[in-house]
């Protein structure tokens, strides 16, 4: 799953490619529909980075349980492919690929040539979806399979979006010229909840007032199903606070004595005149509440259900 985060065709690459293409876009007003397309998809990719990281963190939760200094606390992970996740990463996601190679800015293609960049994006999504299917076939963890099912659907929308943009600019039907990868999402169980909600047909604007010209590019029939492509009325997909992963003392995350940090935080809140309980919600436990912690099995099942 790390490959889907920090690999050449991972979510870091899609996010940073589209982000810098939108940052560097010249004559934005004159070419608004295409700028709106890049900026909107870049915003969604930012969320995908968080989503992949959440899946990785869920998979690693419990893998390094134990007490520092006690024999065997990390014995079960010493033979893993990437021990850096436990030594340097706190049993969590790293900005690396599946073999520990760091993600690189060299993966970003932002030439300023709109047709060239859109063509690059089309094939970037092609490679990304290809890798997602391979990872799906390699994993059994339910959160990982739920993740890949979702990303296969949303990545397909982005691939179609870039194909439609190129067709509008050049007349070339990319989906007919390059019908790849052939991924039967209708036969993948983890894709079904998202397809039933129409997530394979719509793009989001991630803004109440901006990026409305996206509709000038993203329209017409879906090349595989014939259903109409639409810009969603809701500004973004429904989300939820991240899950409050339990402390992992063996890797000092968030420290060797997590309770001490909680006690210090409580005293600081009291000194600042804040309520006894933390204000707002930045995380929820496996039961969907904002208080308490969950064990590894609870986190795994709840993240799987939430992604689905």
State the predicted function of each range.
Residues 1-288, 292-307:
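Non-heme di-metal
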